[in-house]
Amino acid sequence: MIYDDNKFETIASIPDMRERTIILNGFSKYYAMTGWRIGYIVCDKSLMDPLMRLSFYSISCPNTFVQRAAVSALKEDDRASREMVAEYQRRRDYMCRELNMLKGCRCDKPSGAFYIFLDIRETGLSSEAFCQLMLNKHFVTMTPGHVFGDNCEGFVRISYANSMENLEIAMKRMNEALETL
């Protein structure tokens, strides 16, 4: 899922890379099948047997309805997915504009997915303390950056995979929280 007319180019399209590339992908984001835990592997035939032996017990036997949904997603027109990507882009633009107006916060526009990595270092709070404040006092949830590695301390990850109404409420609450710091 990418925005702003950016183009994705797989490494497999580079000369001599196709046979050396392993693509692992799923249906969660683009086909709105989050939590269904189904995906696929694209690789050179010589790599398939070792990969299947390695992963068989952790990825085998998805539910029948999930398998059928994945097949349908691949066969059907992706108009609904394209419309959802456009909606996510609209939400991303709104969130970035609003988040960049918050006291002590800054973010760049992500080129894909539905998460924003918000820089909160100017607030003086750790990412954990920031998340606890937002959740416990203002009922807005997000993920502290430190869970993504030590270099991500001072950031929080915010999802905009929600309704515009809820995102507007979250922005109002975050603004109120930061005005009291």
Where are these regions (language model features)?
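PLP-dependent class I/II
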Residues: 1-181
